[in-house]
Amino acid sequence: MKVKKGGGGAGTATESAPGPSGQSVAPIPQPPAESESGSESEPDAGPGPRPGPLQRKQPIGPEDVLGLQRITGDYLCSPEENIYKIDFVRFKIRDMDSGTVLFEIKKPPVSERLPINRRDLDPNAGRFVRYQFTPAFLRLRQVGATVEFTVGDKPVNNFRMIERHYFRNQLLKSFDFHFGFCIPSSKNTCEHIYDFPPLSEELISEMIRHPYETQSDSFYFVDDRLVMHNKADYSYSGTP
């Protein structure tokens, strides 16, 4: 597939599925966050994710998430809504200036995966990733992210990803990538180019000093309907 161009981003990782990272670790529970929209407030809540306005809206389309001004409080769709059985199996990120591969992660083939007891399986397992980067990552200007994914027995029309990055609920950058059409039962590979936004020295220092307060939502759409939602947070201190 073609190389696609986007806006900005960052990465190192701890996860159970492909994503921007240098190391792989178990998924980490997502902490509670603020409301999904800067324009609609939510009541105070106890422990756990807070419901937001978009969680009560179906279906959710691209324009809905493009209006979000802060990280979502919870996932906006269930794993069961991925009726196309889209499965990301490999992820690689490289510095476009030097060509250096910053990290690569790959799922083992289905035949090599350990059997699981579905009754004990967290329904959100694999949807959250924790990334650990060095401070130097914040000074990169452009990276290429190669993703390999498979689809099930349904055709995938107008496959699109919108990824929004925040620091302390301030929007840093929004990326919008179009994968296009994927034929049924296919394996697909493409590289997206992330142009990172310029960051002030003050903001870089704050992002380094406050690990995991940089967060992102990744929304995946088929025919303008949300079918997958992944989350991540980031540390740029170079340590877990």
Curated annotation (Swiss-Prot):
Residues reported to bind tetradecanoate: 131
Region described as Required for centrosome localization: spans on this chain: 121-240
Keyword Transmembrane (UniProt): no
Modified residues (Phosphoserine): 37, 39, 41
Record field: compositional bias (Gly residues): 1-11
Primary location recorded for the protein, binned into one broad class: cytoplasm
InterPro entries named among the record's database cross-references: Ig_E-set (IPR014756), PDE6D_unc-119_myristoyl-bd (IPR051519), PDED_dom (IPR008015), PDED_dom_sf (IPR037036)
Gene Ontology BP terms: chemical synaptic transmission; endocytosis; lipoprotein transport; mitotic cytokinesis; negative regulation of caveolin-mediated endocytosis; negative regulation of clathrin-dependent endocytosis; nervous system development; phototransduction
Keyword annotations: Cone-rod dystrophy, Cytoplasm, Cytoskeleton, Disease variant, Endocytosis, Lipid-binding, Phosphoprotein, Protein transport, Sensory transduction, Transport, Vision
A GO CC annotation given for this chain: spindle pole
GO molecular function: lipid binding
Disease: Immunodeficiency 13: A rare and heterogeneous syndrome defined by a reproducible reduction in the CD4 T-lymphocyte count (less than 300 cells per microliter or less than 20% of total T-cells) in the absence of HIV infection or other known causes of immunodeficiency. IMD13 predisposes to infections and malignancy.
UniProt similarity note: Belongs to the PDE6D/unc-119 family.
Subunit structure: Interacts with CABP4; in the absence of calcium. Interacts with DNM1; leading to a decrease of DNM1 GTPase activity. May interact with GTP-bound ARL1. Interacts with ARL2 and ARL3 (GTP-bound forms); this promotes the release of myyristoylated cargo proteins. Found in a complex with ARL3, RP2 and UNC119; RP2 induces hydrolysis of GTP ARL3 in the complex, leading to the release of UNC119. Interacts with NPHP3 (when myristoylated). Interacts with CYS1 (when myristoylated). Interacts with MACIR; interaction only takes place when UNC119 is not liganded with myristoylated proteins.
PANTHER family given in the database record: PROTEIN UNC-119 HOMOLOG A, RETINAL PROTEIN 4
Domain notes: Adopts an immunoglobulin-like beta-sandwich fold forming a hydrophobic cavity that captures N-terminally myristoylated target peptides. Phe residues within the hydrophobic beta sandwich are required for myristate binding.
Function noted in UniProt: Involved in synaptic functions in photoreceptor cells, the signal transduction in immune cells as a Src family kinase activator, endosome recycling, the uptake of bacteria and endocytosis, protein trafficking in sensory neurons and as lipid-binding chaperone with specificity for a diverse subset of myristoylated proteins. Specifically binds the myristoyl moiety of a subset of N-terminally myristoylated proteins and is required for their localization. Binds myristoylated GNAT1 and is required for G-protein localization and trafficking in sensory neurons.
Protein name: Protein unc-119 homolog A
